[in-house]
């Protein structure tokens, strides 16, 4: 059974701006995750590059490149589509791991699943 877990208020996520960080329990470990807004919609992913499993932000909660149209790994420069997490350019092995989110009545929630649970 899935749960909707409050992440933030909608106004905390501006288009192509800072992310809101959160934690999830994924395959036996607490992992960093982040949510961003792009072209009016909210997306969330594990904070883990698909090239080398390390956190991607080069400054706290900063994932967008200078164009504001790609999420970028600060370590190797791999870029990802904000809408899908798919690799656009650089050393990638697949895409980012997506976390389901919803937005209603001024609130953003992330959703537990068989893969993602509340952190321990």
Predicted regions mapped to residue ranges:
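Axial heme c-ligation environment in periplasmic c-type cytochrome domains
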Residues: 90-91
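Short cysteine clusters
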Residues: 49, 73-76
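N-terminal pre-ligand scaffold of iron-sulfur
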Residues: 1-66, 81-82, 95-120
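Active-site metal-binding motif and surrounding structural segment of the metallo-beta-lactamase
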Residues: 68-70
């Amino acid at each position: 059974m899935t749960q909707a877990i409050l992440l933030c208020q909608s106004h905390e996520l501006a288009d192509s701006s800072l992310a809101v960080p959160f934690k999830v329990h994924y395959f036996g470990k607490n992992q960093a995750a982040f949510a961003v807004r792009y072209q009016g919609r909210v997306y969330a992913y594990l904070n883990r590059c698909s090239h080398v499993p390390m956190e991607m932000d080069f400054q706290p909660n900063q994932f967008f490149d200078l164009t504001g149209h790609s999420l970028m790994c600060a370590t190797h420069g791999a870029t990802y589509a904000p809408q899908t997490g798919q690799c656009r350019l650089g050393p990638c092995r697949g895409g980012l791991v997506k976390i389901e989110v919803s937005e209603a009545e001024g609130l953003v929630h992330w959703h537990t699943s068989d893969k993602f649970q509340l952190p321990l």
